[in-house]
A protein has these predicted regions:
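Short amphipathic alpha-helical segments
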Residues: 17-20, 69-72, 97-99
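Glycine-rich, charge-decorated loop segments at or immediately adjacent to ligand/cofactor-binding or catalytic sites
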Residues: 91-102
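C-terminal helix of von Willebrand factor
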Residues: 108-117
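A short, gly/pro- and small-residue-rich
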Residues: 69-84
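Conserved beta-strand scaffold positions in the cores of enzyme catalytic domains, especially
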Residues: 83-85, 102-104
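Conserved N-terminal substructure of TIR/SEFIR domains
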Residues: 1-58, 63, 78-82, 89-91
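Glycine-rich, Arg-bearing micro-motifs that act as flexible, cationic patches
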Residues: 66
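Short low-complexity, flexible loop/linker segments enriched in glycine and/or proline
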Residues: 45-48, 73-74, 100-101
């Protein structure tokens, strides 16, 4: 089981990958659904990984805002007190999350040396 679970919309997989690389360079183990095939057991595997993780980073953008999967993962993470919201693009958060403090990485270029990180 990983230290950190990253929730994201599949079209923003590159952002999840870049963040996972930085976290791993800093000694964390990271899990996100790269390579996981949808189908039987998909939802159970996602839930298992969220429950096992110490923290869940949710990458918010317009696409993830409208994703039932991302919203459900975020709700579970929040209920488990593991939720870390991160903006990667300008978007309004879903109503359930608008009061949460959110880390702003909208200007981050993916570099581990970026001042925006």
């Amino acid at each position: 089981m990983a230290d950190i679970f990253i929730s994201y919309k599949s079209e923003r997989r590159a952002a999840a990958w870049h963040l996972s690389q930085i976290l791993e360079l800093n000694g964390y183990t990271v899990w996100y659904d790269y390579g996981l095939l949808s189908g039987r057991g998909f939802a159970k595997r996602i839930e298992k990984e969220i429950r096992a993780a110490k923290a869940v980073i949710v990458l918010w953008c317009p696409l993830s805002r409208d994703s039932d999967w991302v919203n459900n993962e975020a709700l579970l993470a929040r209920r488990l007190n593991k939720y870390i919201p991160v903006w990667i693009e300008e978007t309004e958060l879903p109503l359930e999350f608008i009061r949460d403090d959110t880390i702003d990485l909208k200007r981050w270029n993916g570099s581990p040396r970026s001042h925006d990180l």
